[in-house]
């Protein structure tokens, strides 16, 4: 199984696709699954499922994500991405390859007459990095139809020793909130800076205040707030008339997330009053935290 999984991963790594636009990826997944004797179907755009009926009352589901990231690969690997601006940089090619190998092994066991304690539903999910393909699959009722009582997923983690698996009860992975601050000021030439409203400086002030406040929270409020992108202004010798800061907030529970979101809004209002700029902070909530 391991050799097949390695081969699957290298094929998939060469042809990364984004979001739920996965025609080549799903074609390859179906090509592997369809000869195995499973019921293969597409629950949503860009998704594939394979159901192995072992004659059991209950079904266990195994899930893998398939989409890549808008990143240019520079690894020099012989199986590197052949698509500029797209790369399997988060390991979803590995997740899909592992699940394909497990599907092949499940088919072998059934053909050999081995008794499985449960039926098996393999779920290949699109849009994990973007719009939430998992939720759309859940909404189709597929898990109720096939009597799924438990579902397992995994994520490759290079920091772990090779050959090891890590899990624990309780929180495993934090929930994500995308944070965006938009600042509106007034652009003037730097020789008349006093007549302008500096959107860049207002954005930086807000960001520094946000960092200072979250870093001072008690250690039992598990959180990460990090800003990774900032754009502002048009030229070096003019006060920036607009600015935008983008970041990520991660927490394990919704109460902590809402407390931090509320304070970031308060900081935006205070910064607007102090600077005269308009500040609008918005959030896009991602997946909930993983709890076992």
Feature locations, PLM:
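Conserved short loop/turn motifs at secondary-structure junctions
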Residues: 18, 124-127, 285-289
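Acidic/His- and Gly-rich active-site-bordering loop/insert found
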Residues: 1-88, 93, 97, 104-118
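Structural signal for hydrophobic packing residues in well-ordered secondary-structure cores
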Residues: 2, 9, 13-16, 33-37, ...
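Metal-dependent amide/peptide-bond hydrolase catalytic core
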Residues: 201-292
